[in-house]
From Swiss-Prot:
InterPro entries: P-loop_NTPase, Small_GTP-bd, Small_GTPase, Small_GTPase_Rho. One of its GO terms (cellular component) is plasma membrane. It is linked to A chromosomal aberration involving RHOH is found in a non-Hodgkin lymphoma cell line. Translocation t(3;4)(q27;p11) with BCL6. This is Rho-related GTP-binding protein RhoH. It comes from Homo sapiens. Its main location: cytoplasm. The region involved in interaction with ZAP70 is a non-canonical immunoreceptor tyrosine-based activation motif (ITAM). The gene is RHOH.
Length: 191
């Protein structure tokens, strides 16, 4: 089993990637928006009684940082592609921009689609035009993501589940890779 996992968050600016990380790592919600250029942090998590060091890499969604963003992709074990349910363009950009960038840099790394700011569906000014769960699930299927999750860093709903799923997805991918290696090492050849 993996003793450390690298999890990279991508998506447009201001979709809530940093808020999601802050809520998960410090159980607080940042009051002011602060654009991210490149940031990483780590926490220890437990899965099935085993401690895993989870490295969390927050990337800039702004196109001005497109050239340095791939540096954070190196050796990623799982990618969280995030969009805000209140920002339809951020949703469309997962398919039109982000999945292409991820697949060209990390062709075999599992991806999860994460809908953020779900509290906006109940109380936001754009609640009537918010992206619904069915649209999000369909997008996840279209981009061949390993899963679809929803969360709100503001209300702390679904945050823990996002990272539990990320860890489980990375561990399962590593197990599959190891099984394939075992089979290729133990191949029997008859001449």
């Amino acid at each position: 089993m993996l003793s450390s996992i690298k999890c990279v968050l991508v998506g447009d600016s201001a979709v809530g990637k940093t808020s999601l990380l802050v809520r998960f790592t410090s159980e607080t919600f940042p009051e002011a928006y602060k654009p991210t250029v490149y940031e990483n942090t780590g926490v220890d998590v437990f899965m099935d009684g085993i401690q895993i060091s989870l490295g969390l890499w927050d990337t800039a969604g702004n196109d001005a940082f497109r050239s340095i963003r791939p540096l954070s992709y190196q050796q990623a074990d799982v990618v969280l592609m995030c969009y805000s349910v209140a920002n339809h363009n951020s949703f469309l950009n997962l398919k039109n921009k982000w999945i292409g960038e991820i697949r060209s840099n990390l062709p075999c790394t599992p991806v999860l689609v994460v809908a953020t700011q779900t509290d906006q569906r109940e109380m936001g000014p754009h609640r009537a035009s918010c992206v619904n769960a069915m649209e999000g699930k369909k997008l996840a299927q279209d981009v061949r993501a390993k899963g679809y999750l929803e969360c709100s860093a503001l209300s702390n709903r679904g945050v823990q589940q996002v990272f539990e799923c990320a860890v489980r997805t990375a561990v399962n991918q590593a197990r599959r890779r190891n099984r394939r290696r075992l089979f290729s090492i133990n191949e029997c050849k008859i001449f």
